[in-house]
Amino acid sequence: MPDPLSFRIKKQFDRYLHDPIMAIIAIPLFLIFKLLPYKFSSYFCGTLMYLIAPLTSYNKRVKKHLKIVFPKKSLEEINKLTSQHWFMLGQTIGEMPHINNLIKSGNLETEGLDRIKKGPAILVGAHMGNWEFLLRVGDLAGRRAGYVFRPINNWILNKIQIYRNKDANADFYRKGRIAAIGMASKLKNGEIVGLTGDQLLREGIMVPFFGIETPTPQAAAIMAIKWNVPIYMVRVERYKYSKFFEMDLSKMVFLKFTKKHIHLSAE
């Protein structure tokens, strides 16, 4: 069935007008952040997001979700968490041009990398702390990993994002069939793959999440069962003082499938 006319018009509008305009705004800002010291860039961008984001419609969405997660918190506490959320998101954006420098200067402490130095493994992370470090976990362990990514909704910025991560010593697979083939090939060859498990999806299995049926990605579990490969949860935590970030890998999780049950064990 052909796309509706309105969809085709919007697609052309985004490609030739909306996306270039947004790129013209974003690229100079990115270059400015890159020229600034990383601490100043982090704080400056965090402050910008802290001031601007509450004026957008996304602010109501954040508060709505926080109320679901923390139903007993007061409105004042929810507002405080919302402000902290926007500030940290701004910090992450301001730190993006400095990821390699943050690692080289010792601002990232790691724990558990020895667990993935040999053999196949599936790494599952989330958009926490500064998720840009997730793309470096394989390289930090001396391995060339394969990562699944969801393209940015801007074809120009998406190309820049891919180019920016060219030094991550990794292969990148666009979410979909290509990613499934790429991950399967990596695991069969005894290598490691990584993906984030908290992206908004319209597909997947429905799982209760804070009492709400939510589409949930299942690729990691399916691959782990099919090839008997361990899953490691990768967590990045942000600190205010001394060290800047810590990234650690959990104990390995094995999933074993029988006709009636899926058994989970940790080592």
Residue ranges of predicted features:
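Non-catalytic C-terminal accessory region of glycerolipid acyltransferases
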Residues: 2, 72, 76, 80-83, ...
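Membrane-anchoring hydrophobic helices of lipid-metabolizing enzymes
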Residues: 2-125, 130, 159-162, 169, ...
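Short, composition-biased local secondary-structure segments
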Residues: 31-35, 130-135, 181-194
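A generic structural-conservation signal
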Residues: 42, 76, 147, 173-174, ...
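Active-site metal-coordination segments of metallo-dependent hydrolases
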Residues: 60-61, 150-155, 214-217
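Residues within well-ordered alpha-helices
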Residues: 62, 134, 160-161, 182, ...
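Catalytic core of membrane glycerolipid acyltransferases/transacylases, capturing the structured
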Residues: 120-177, 202-205, 238
